[in-house]
């Protein structure tokens, strides 16, 4: 049975500013990549955290059937949120421990729903540290952002 991995990343030029998200999906058997799919998208005015969340959401939502998958992210915000903080937020009616509304609540709710139909293992990796699949996800995120970046004026 092949193993399924989603390598996810978000990018933002300014925070807020134009941003993009990228996903590298891989089905692997042993050392052999059986199937690979790349996804990306972006927004004109966003934040890095929103793009990191959208990368994970799109990775899970694109799967056609319930799957066992490892989602690899360089975002401690996403990893800590989905494996820890989210349980308290849900218990507190989507409020933080300080009784403030959770930032990006609509995306956290969407991620919660997206992961519910899968058996997800979440893994954090250090970003920009030479991890080839994470670097590819970063390239995809920057490609997703590109249409939303202002064009540089030529001198």
Curated annotation (Swiss-Prot):
Kindly list the cofactors needed: Mg(2+)
Gene Ontology MF annotations: magnesium ion binding; nucleic acid binding; RNA-DNA hybrid ribonuclease activity
- In which residues is Mg(2+) 2 bound? 9, 138
Residues bound to Mg(2+) 1 are 9, 52, 74
Q: Name one Pfam family in it.
A: RNase_H
User: Does the keyword Magnesium feature in the UniProt annotation?
Assistant: yes
| Enzyme Commission designation | 3.1.26.4
Q: Domain RNase H type-1: where? A: 1-146
For the protein in the UniProt heading, the enzyme class is hydrolase
Q: Which reaction does it catalyse?
A: Endonucleolytic cleavage to 5'-phosphomonoester
User: Per the record's keyword annotation, is Hydrolase included, yes or no?
Assistant: yes
Assembly, per entry = Monomer.
User: What name is this protein filed under?
Assistant: Ribonuclease H
The organism's taxonomic lineage, starting at the top: Bacteria, Pseudomonadati, Pseudomonadota, Alphaproteobacteria, Rhodobacterales
